[in-house]
Amino acid sequence: MAPSFVTIDTTPDFDMAPAPSFQPMSTGSPSKRTLLLAPPSIATQEEKLRDLFTAFDRSTTDLQMLDRISAGFVSLPANTYDHILVLTDTDGTRRSEALHLLTRDVYTALVPCMKAGAKLQTQDNFFGEAEEREAVLAGLIKTDAGFEKMDQPKSFAIPLRRNGKKKDAAKTETFAPAPAPAPPVQPVTVGMINNDDDYENDDDLIDEDTLLSDEDLKRPIQPPECQPKPGRRRRACKDCTCGLAARLEAEEQAEREKADKALNVMKLETEDLNELDFTVQGKTGSCGNCALGDAFRCAGCPFIGLPAFKPGQEVQILENVAQL
């Protein structure tokens, strides 16, 4: 029987050391901090959260919800993060949900917490047009991988010095300058006023007679036409010079002549009044047989049914009976 060999395992069954961190973006220094911005739907998936903290070091990584930052429930520390990653999934599954929450209020809260040179990215490297515009308005610079916060130049005050040459020249001069001679005193005289002077320049720059040529003077001046107020009838002015009064008068005259012609059509001649005017003596009706004094009339007489009467005699009809 061959001898048996027994080996002893000295490795611990449970290792307390943290798992090696895997960072998608090489930070170059373990002290750089990363901020993960997650949409609200990722909070219900424990496997996604577990995978995130296996890929990022917990000691240098913070996780915040986009909806809480947008509502103002979270205050981020200023000038802290070197990398901000928006969790949209590598295939862009949560892109619309995450980018919808990247409003101006969120950018206002993110930019102060970013260090100079910090980067803002998404997992699928995609930003919409509205998100890019808000990022640029917030002060970020667009790069190939996302957006970056540029280093703000330091401002310092520069003291302004006065020109010292004048002071040095003033110090070297020890003598007082000689006083300038006083101007001679003019004697007081009485001024004369010329009333004929019109205080105008006699030199005319433009001759007003040459402004209009002979052709301009011969050209008729067309006055503006009188326009009535809205909702009112067109009427000519009292001293109308545009021709509107004459035009309206001609229109009225034409309408008057037209009305007179219409009246003349219905006017009866003297011969046509025989049947109507009973005062005409020696006239017969249109039948040519019966006169006013005839007691018996023919069938075609217009006076049929009327008794004999004299010219000028008044005829009254009472109860369908002629009364002479």
From Swiss-Prot:
<dbReference type="InterPro" id="IPR031838">
    <property type="entry name" value="Dre2_N"/>
</dbReference>
<dbReference type="InterPro" id="IPR007785">
    <property type="entry name" value="Anamorsin"/>
</dbReference>
<feature type="binding site">
    <location>
        <position position="242"/>
    </location>
    <ligand>
        <name>[2Fe-2S] cluster</name>
    </ligand>
</feature>
<feature type="region of interest" description="Linker">
    <location>
        <begin position="159"/>
        <end position="217"/>
    </location>
</feature>
<keyword id="KW-0408">Iron</keyword>
<dbReference type="InterPro" id="IPR046408">
    <property type="entry name" value="CIAPIN1"/>
</dbReference>
<feature type="region of interest" description="Fe-S binding site B">
    <location>
        <begin position="287"/>
        <end position="301"/>
    </location>
</feature>
<keyword id="KW-0496">Mitochondrion</keyword>
<dbReference type="GO" id="GO:0046872">
    <property type="term" value="F:metal ion binding"/>
</dbReference>
<feature type="binding site">
    <location>
        <position position="290"/>
    </location>
    <ligand>
        <name>[4Fe-4S] cluster</name>
    </ligand>
</feature>
<feature type="binding site">
    <location>
        <position position="298"/>
    </location>
    <ligand>
        <name>[4Fe-4S] cluster</name>
    </ligand>
</feature>
<dbReference type="GO" id="GO:0009055">
    <property type="term" value="F:electron transfer activity"/>
</dbReference>
<dbReference type="GO" id="GO:0016226">
    <property type="term" value="P:iron-sulfur cluster assembly"/>
</dbReference>
<feature type="binding site">
    <location>
        <position position="240"/>
    </location>
    <ligand>
        <name>[2Fe-2S] cluster</name>
    </ligand>
</feature>
<feature type="binding site">
    <location>
        <position position="287"/>
    </location>
    <ligand>
        <name>[4Fe-4S] cluster</name>
    </ligand>
</feature>
<dbReference type="GO" id="GO:0051537">
    <property type="term" value="F:2 iron, 2 sulfur cluster binding"/>
</dbReference>
<feature type="region of interest" description="N-terminal SAM-like domain">
    <location>
        <begin position="28"/>
        <end position="158"/>
    </location>
</feature>
<feature type="short sequence motif" description="Cx2C motif 1">
    <location>
        <begin position="287"/>
        <end position="290"/>
    </location>
</feature>
<dbReference type="Pfam" id="PF16803">
    <property type="entry name" value="DRE2_N"/>
</dbReference>
<dbReference type="Pfam" id="PF05093">
    <property type="entry name" value="CIAPIN1"/>
</dbReference>
<comment type="function">
    <text>Component of the cytosolic iron-sulfur (Fe-S) protein assembly (CIA) machinery required for the maturation of extramitochondrial Fe-S proteins. Part of an electron transfer chain functioning in an early step of cytosolic Fe-S biogenesis, facilitating the de novo assembly of a [4Fe-4S] cluster on the scaffold complex cfd1-nbp35. Electrons are transferred to dre2 from NADPH via the FAD- and FMN-containing protein tah18.</text>
</comment>
<keyword id="KW-0001">2Fe-2S</keyword>
<comment type="similarity">
    <text>Belongs to the anamorsin family.</text>
</comment>
<feature type="binding site">
    <location>
        <position position="237"/>
    </location>
    <ligand>
        <name>[2Fe-2S] cluster</name>
    </ligand>
</feature>
<keyword id="KW-0411">Iron-sulfur</keyword>
<feature type="short sequence motif" description="Cx2C motif 2">
    <location>
        <begin position="298"/>
        <end position="301"/>
    </location>
</feature>
<keyword id="KW-0963">Cytoplasm</keyword>
<keyword id="KW-0479">Metal-binding</keyword>
<dbReference type="GO" id="GO:0005758">
    <property type="term" value="C:mitochondrial intermembrane space"/>
</dbReference>
<keyword id="KW-0004">4Fe-4S</keyword>
<feature type="binding site">
    <location>
        <position position="226"/>
    </location>
    <ligand>
        <name>[2Fe-2S] cluster</name>
    </ligand>
</feature>
<feature type="binding site">
    <location>
        <position position="301"/>
    </location>
    <ligand>
        <name>[4Fe-4S] cluster</name>
    </ligand>
</feature>
<dbReference type="GO" id="GO:0051539">
    <property type="term" value="F:4 iron, 4 sulfur cluster binding"/>
</dbReference>
<comment type="subunit">
    <text>Monomer. Interacts with tah18. Interacts with mia40.</text>
</comment>
<protein>
    <recommendedName>
        <fullName>Fe-S cluster assembly protein dre2</fullName>
    </recommendedName>
</protein>
<feature type="region of interest" description="Fe-S binding site A">
    <location>
        <begin position="226"/>
        <end position="242"/>
    </location>
</feature>
